[in-house]
Structures are given as structure tokens and as C-alpha cells.
């Protein structure tokens, strides 16, 4: 009889190989599979169908049709390609787990006589999860971990498990998701301004053309309607607009894949692009020494995950896969790319396709303003995540305070060391020879503002003026403009930017501008700022003279659908259209000062109003 291994479902245990798809990605990246695209597709398909609890789709005929492109009515007796490829796949899996994957505690195999993959443990898992080590070399412990699905009983034959229980154990989606299950794209906008209404409609239509399902990767969206890959930077940026459309499950799926892909063998970089089949794109990944990446991406992803947690309340973003990624991104990742311990992360010439900036054109920086900005934003996001994990006085709360202090120190140093007084703007980056580059690089400077790096004051205003004078080379960079201008009070410029990028979305091949327009309308123009874990939603009207009133309705926020209606910048109404009671904090701005009302409780179906006194 096969040995059975039982794990405590409620204990804070992270068995190795918890994310099956991460295991498949490592297998696909190994020398045994790198140049075997059909075997990778075969493996991705059968694992995906198993995780989707669809074993009836793992048949010879369907594999032949969906993986190898054979007609749906082909006769397996006349074509043995599936059986032949299955034998090769089994052999290569066996070689992987004997060789490069000899360290893998979880083994994946496809038993002879069928095509349904099975997972089992090479050896019993310890009941105590290894404690993560901080960059100071001291152990850290997370308080109050969220409940997760764990591997239940895994053995050579998964004996003792029902099929349903096994599938639940293998799924990566956690149980603690409190987000609503409303259909995507129910959100609507009405306004006195026909241009704004049209812009919203165009952006919504274009964005939904970039949304996919039914691929081995699961639910996902891309930066253009014909893409078959998704990119880490694009997803981090598009996730704000995707939240407006109710695509929280698509977003979590993609962010999880990126988080799981970060590895010590690549100095904690993840995969820059992932295909619809769940593998790193060969254009950006050849092996662990030759891959394309931009160093701000890890930090951008940490920030995006935290924003999704605040918007959706989905505590999956606190599980082991994500938490491990956050921990490594603010510790091991920083150390790996700051070898000289100067406090600035730097690109390493040994990794020729790893860039310090999202800007990949000359000049090539060793360190960039957008990298520093992303690191600053990630430290603040990490602090917010730690706040959600611990009680007052706990280690998590102390870590939150530590990383807020780190963020403040980074901002202060940037403010003093990177200011170009001669040109009244910040430098864009540090060159490989250690000098500050005098060239203005739009991506570096715009993203630094996007991440909120510069402190408020005259330098911010000068930086915004510089943005106004320097139209970016890339429309994708320009798509960041509206929200940046809205955040810093230039509402007229934000409004014009929204109309421009939404108009681009109707004829521009990339859908990124569409997602950006939706995000800028909701969080910029409407000022919707949810904090679902704490049951508070804040609003701040940033309308212009062209817009007398605007109403955004059926907006999914956590388990609720809400409607927010602004009349100018002095009156707001809030409706809880669906869901449990929420707390609303109306905020207004006048003459550069913020005025916040007392928090109101809004029950389901109820509407309340607030005005600037």
C-alpha cells in the first residue's frame, strides 16, 4: 500500500511545490523542454485541465485536436502522434526529476495507460515551514496567516483521496476570496459631458477585446487584442482599469503566475512575459543567465498586488505564494542587485538583457529614477501588507514601521541627490560610470512620478511642467499621464489626457491605453480609493469646468457594487447598489486643501450625500 502523507490544513505550512503551475514553469524552462514546444504545450494542457477539474478533457482525441491541431474527428488508430509524444514526455519528465529537478520535493508524472497527470511527494513534508530570513540575517515570523488550501493527502497513487478533494488540493485559488462574483464589465458611466461618456465607452469596449479565457493559462488579459502573451509591467499597469471592469480573478491569476516565477537562480527576477499556455515567452527567456527583464518590475508587482488587495479585499494576496514574493522582493532581490551596498540597485553587465529602467532605449542606465520610484512604492505597499497581517505591537506591525522608514529615507535621498538644479528637474538615471545623466528620459521621469517618489513641493510642480513640455515617445508611457496629473491636482490636464488615451484606444493596437483610461477615470477623475480590508471607500471629485456632473455606477469594489455621482467638485452622492454595508468617507479639495467628512455607513440599496461646507 502506498504511504500516505497528511498535512494540517490550518497550520502555517507551505509544502514545497504548492503551486503546481510554478512547477510546470520550472520544468518547461529546463534544458529537457526548452526547445520542445510541442511537449511544453502537451504538458501545459493536461495540467491545466486537471487543475480545472476537467479530466474528461484529457483524452487522446482532445489532446490531438487542441494541442497538435488535428481535426476533431480524426482517428487515433490512423495517427499515433499523441501516444508517441506522451512516451517522450514521460521519459523527459523522468529525466528532469532525476537530474535538474532532483531537488523538487513534488514530482509530476503521467502514468502509462492514460494522460491525466499526477503529483506526489518525493518525501514527507515537514510540519514546520522554514522561517523566511530577512536581509539583516534574522528570522522573521508572520502573525495570523490567512487560511490556505494545502496539499491534503499525496502519495505515489494519491491513495485515500476522492477526485474532488484532490482537485481542491491542487488548485491554486485560495478560499479566502471575499470579492463579489458579478459579471465583468457591468460598470457604466453617465455624464453631462458627451466626450467623457464616449471616452469611457470606447475604453471599455477596447479593453474587453483584450480579455481571454479557455487557454491553458486560465483567465487573462493582454495589452493588445491579438497578443498571445502578457507582460509583467503591462499587467501591473492595466490592473487598475481591470479592477473597474470586475476582472479581479483574471488579475489575480496573472499576478500569481508572475509572483511564483521569481527565483533565486535569476536573482529573484520573475518571467517578464508569459504565454497563454503558461510558459515564459522564448523571446524574453532562454535560460537563467539569458533573459529579458526590467528591474522596476518586481516592485511594480508588489504595489499592484497591494492595490488589488485594497480594491477587492481578496486575501489570496496574503497567501504563501504572494507573501514569499513580497518578502524576497524587498530583501533578497534588493541585495542581489545592490552588490556594492550603495543603497542604489544597479543593472549587472553579466545579465545583458536586464535593464535598470523600463526605458530600454539608450542611454542605458545603471540605476534609474523609475527603479528608485518603484522601490519606494513597493516599500510602502509592503508596509501596508504587514499592517494587514499583524495585531498592534506585533512583529508584522514593527516591520511595517521599518519599511515606511526605509521608504522615507529613499525619498529623502532621491530628493537631495538626484535634483538637477541647472535644469530645474530630477535626473533620469545614473550611468554605468557613476555619473548622473543630464538627458531627460520620459519613461524614467514619468514613472517616478507615477510611483509617488518626489516629495510635495516646488520640485513636483517643476517635474509636472517638464512632463507637459515633453510628450513621450511611446503612447504607453503617455497613458500614465492622466492619473499622475490628477494625483497632483492638475485636473484640466488629467481630463484632456483621459480623452486622448481613450480616443487612442479605439484605433491604437495596444489595449493598455484603454485600461489606463478606465483606471484614470475611476481613481483619478472620480477619486475612488477603496480600502476593502478595512471596509472604507473614499471619494474625491476632480471634475473640470467641462464636466458639470458624472455618475459611475455598478462599479465593483470588494463584495459590493457601488455608484458614485459628483456634481462639480463640491457635492457627491454614494449608493451601495449591492452587497453588505460599507463605510464611505467623502473628501473634497479647495484651494489646495483637503476636507474630509466623517465616515458614513451605507447599507445595501442606500444612498447618502455630502457637500463641501
Functional labels for PLM-detected ranges:
Residues 144, 150-171:
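N-terminal export signals
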Residues 199-201, 228-264, 320, 324-331, ...:
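Active-site core of glycosidic bond-cleaving carbohydrate-active enzymes
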Residues 183-205, 245, 258-271, 306-370, ...:
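Active-site acid/base region of carbohydrate-active enzymes
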Residues 217-228, 270-300, 315, 331-404, ...:
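The feature captures the catalytic groove of carbohydrate-active enzymes
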Residues 2-125:
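An N-terminal, helix-rich hydrophobic module
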Residues 491-613:
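Non-catalytic C-terminal accessory modules of carbohydrate-active enzymes
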Residues 173-230, 253, 413, 418-419:
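Low-complexity, Ser/Thr/Pro/Gly-enriched N-terminal "stalk/linker" regions
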Amino acid at each position: 500500500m502506498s504511504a500516505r502523507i497528511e498535512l494540517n490544513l490550518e497550520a502555517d505550512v507551505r509544502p514545497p511545490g504548492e503551486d503546481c503551475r510554478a512547477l510546470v514553469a520550472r520544468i518547461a524552462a529546463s534544458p529537457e523542454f526548452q526547445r520542445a514546444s510541442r511537449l511544453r504545450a502537451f504538458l501545459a494542457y493536461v495540467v491545466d485541465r486537471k487543475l480545472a477539474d476537467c479530466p474528461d478533457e484529457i483524452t487522446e482525441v482532445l489532446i490531438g485536436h487542441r494541442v497538435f491541431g488535428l481535426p476533431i474527428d480524426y482517428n487515433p488508430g490512423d495517427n499515433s502522434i499523441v501516444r508517441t509524444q506522451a512516451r517522450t514526455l514521460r521519459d523527459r519528465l523522468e529525466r528532469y526529476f532525476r537530474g535538474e529537478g532532483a531537488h523538487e520535493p513534488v514530482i509530476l508524472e503521467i502514468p502509462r495507460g492514460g494522460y491525466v497527470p499526477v503529483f506526489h511527494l518525493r518525501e514527507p513534508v515537514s510540519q514546520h515551514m522554514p522561517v523566511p530570513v530577512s536581509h539583516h540575517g534574522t528570522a522573521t515570523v508572520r502573525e495570523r496567516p490567512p487560511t490556505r488550501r494545502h496539499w491534503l493527502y499525496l502519495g505515489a497513487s494519491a491513495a485515500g483521496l476522492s477526485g474532488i478533494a484532490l482537485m481542491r488540493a491542487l488548485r491554486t485559488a485560495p478560499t479566502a476570496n471575499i470579492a463579489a462574483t458579478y459579471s465583468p464589465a457591468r460598470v457604466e458611466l453617465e455624464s453631462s459631458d458627451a466626450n467623457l461618456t464616449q471616452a469611457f465607452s470606447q475604453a471599455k469596449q477596447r479593453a474587453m477585446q483584450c480579455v481571454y479565457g479557455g487557454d491553458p493559462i486560465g483567465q487573462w488579459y493582454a495589452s493588445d487584442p491579438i497578443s498571445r502573451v502578457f507582460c509583467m509591467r503591462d499587467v501591473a499597469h492595466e490592473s487598475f482599469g481591470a479592477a473597474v471592469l470586475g476582472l479581479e480573478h483574471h488579475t489575480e491569476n496573472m499576478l500569481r503566475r508572475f509572483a511564483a516565477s521569481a527565483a533565486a537562480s535569476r536573482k529573484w527576477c520573475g518571467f517578464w512575459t508569459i504565454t497563454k499556455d503558461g510558459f515564459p515567452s522564448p523571446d524574453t527567456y532562454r535560460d537563467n543567465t539569458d533573459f529579458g527583464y526590467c528591474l522596476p518590475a518586481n516592485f511594480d508587482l508588489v504595489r499592484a498586488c497591494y492595490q488589488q488587495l485594497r480594491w477587492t479585499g481578496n486575501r489570496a494576496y496574503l497567501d504563501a505564494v504572494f507573501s514569499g514574493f513580497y518578502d524576497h522582493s524587498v530583501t533578497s532581490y534588493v541585495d542581489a542587485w545592490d552588490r556594492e551596498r550603495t543603497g542604489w540597485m544597479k543593472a549587472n553587465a553579466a545579465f545583458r538583457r536586464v535593464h535598470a529602467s523600463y526605458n530600454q532605449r539608450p542611454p542605458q542606465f545603471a540605476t534609474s529614477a523609475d527603479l528608485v520610484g518603484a522601490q519606494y512604492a513597493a516599500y510602502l505597499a509592503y508596509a501596508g501588507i504587514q499592517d494587514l497581517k499583524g495585531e498592534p505591537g506585533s512583529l508584522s506591525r514593527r516591520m511595517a514601521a521599518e519599511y515606511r522608514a526605509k521608504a522615507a529615507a529613499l525619498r529623502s535621498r532621491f530628493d537631495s541627490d538626484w535634483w538637477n538644479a541647472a535644469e530645474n528637474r530630477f535626473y533620469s538615471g545614473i550611468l554605468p560610470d557613476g555619473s548622473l545623466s543630464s538627458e531627460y528620459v520620459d519613461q524614467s521621469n514619468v514613472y517616478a512620478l507615477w510611483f509617488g517618489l518626489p516629495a510635495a513641493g516646488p520640485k513636483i510642480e517643476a517635474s509636472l511642467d517638464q512632463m507637459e513640455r515633453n510628450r513621450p515617445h511611446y503612447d504607453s508611457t503617455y497613458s500614465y499621464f492622466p492619473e499622475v496629473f490628477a494625483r497632483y491636482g492638475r485636473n484640466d490636464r488629467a481630463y484632456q489626457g483621459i480623452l486622448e488615451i481613450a480616443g487612442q484606444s479605439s484605433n491604437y493596437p495596444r489595449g493598455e491605453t484603454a485600461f489606463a483610461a478606465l483606471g484614470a477615470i475611476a481613481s483619478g477623475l472620480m477619486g475612488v480609493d477603496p480600502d476593502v480590508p478595512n471596509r472604507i471607500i473614499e471619494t474625491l471629485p476632480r471634475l473640470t469646468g467641462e464636466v458639470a456632473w458624472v455618475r459611475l455606477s455598478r462599479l465593483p469594489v470588494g463584495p459590493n457594487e457601488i455608484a458614485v455621482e459628483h456634481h462639480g467638485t463640491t457635492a457627491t452622492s454614494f449608493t451601495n447598489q449591492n452587497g453588505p454595508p460599507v463605510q464611505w468617507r467623502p473628501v473634497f479639495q479647495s484651494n489646495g486643501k483637503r476636507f474630509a467628512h466623517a465616515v458614513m455607513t451605507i447599507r445595501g440599496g442606500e444612498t447618502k450625500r455630502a457637500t463641501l461646507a
